[in-house]
């Protein structure tokens, strides 16, 4: 990875709070320090798991140790996988395509089933208030810089296409199916991916390719 990568995790704050994804266990200390610097884990109401690949779910057990009240949200298969990964009881909410979770203050999260992108249990999460679509690995890239967003298209374009061809291209039919479901959502202002900068300035150009 000549330009590095990032492991992205997100906090959605409404009347209730959701944490979207965790990180890889090899970054345990850095992640947990960052998370607890941003929020008291006792305030996390929901832990949304986009899929159970280790770089997104590797610290679920650690988060639940500090936030035992959190309800884990995921596809049916994801919840089943997690049971075998963390070996402990946990509160859960199984969601399917079109299901919604109201966090309050206008933050209604709608879930999009996106299997095989590139894990069998993948879901996207769409926040209708902020128009942010959390897509896990889809539309991501292995690229790391000081920029949070895709404000330098020329710098990221090569890595974006390479990532797509390696991870998403083999599942092109699944990509098209997910995009059809995405089209049923409201306007998408930002694509918050699991790796690399978030797409804000080139959403149409990059997700349409």
Give residue ranges: language-model regions.
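Conserved beta-strand hairpin/beta-sheet module of binuclear metal-dependent hydrolase folds
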Residues: 1-37, 124-127, 131-135
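Short, glycine/acidic-enriched loop or turn micro-motifs at the edges of active sites
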Residues: 24-25, 54, 140, 198
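Long, charged amphipathic helices and adjacent flexible linkers at domain junctions
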Residues: 203-209
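Active-site metal-binding motif and surrounding structural segment of the metallo-beta-lactamase
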Residues: 15, 26-73
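Active-site neighborhood of phospho(di)ester-bond hydrolases with catalytic His/Asp-centered motifs
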Residues: 20-22, 44-52, 72-75, 133-136, ...
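Metallo-beta-lactamase
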Residues: 74-201
């Amino acid at each position: 990875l000549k330009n590095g990568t990032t492991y992205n995790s997100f906090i959605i704050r409404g009347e209730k709070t959701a944490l979207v994804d965790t990180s890889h266990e090899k970054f345990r200390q850095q992640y947990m320090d960052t998370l607890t610097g941003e929020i008291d884990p006792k305030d996390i109401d929901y832990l949304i798991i986009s899929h159970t690949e280790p770089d997104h779910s590797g610290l679920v057990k650690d988060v639940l140790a500090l936030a035992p009240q959190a309800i884990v949200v995921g596809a049916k298969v994801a919840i089943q996988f997690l049971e075998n990964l963390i070996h402990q009881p946990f509160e859960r909410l199984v969601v399917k395509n079109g299901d919604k979770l109201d966090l309050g203050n206008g933050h209604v999260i709608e879930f999009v089933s996106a299997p095989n992108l590139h894990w069998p249990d993948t879901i996207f999460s769409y926040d209708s208030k902020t128009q942010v679509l959390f897509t896990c690995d889809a539309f991501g890239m292995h690229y790391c810089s000081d920029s949070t967003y895709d404000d330098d298209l020329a710098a990221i374009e090569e890595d974006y296409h390479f990532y797509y061809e390696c991870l998403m291209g083999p599942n092109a039919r699944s990509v098209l199916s997910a995009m059809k479901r995405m089209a049923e959502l409201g306007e998408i202002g930002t694509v918050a991916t699991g790796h690399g900068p978030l797409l804000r300035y080139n959403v149409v150009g990059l997700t349409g390719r």
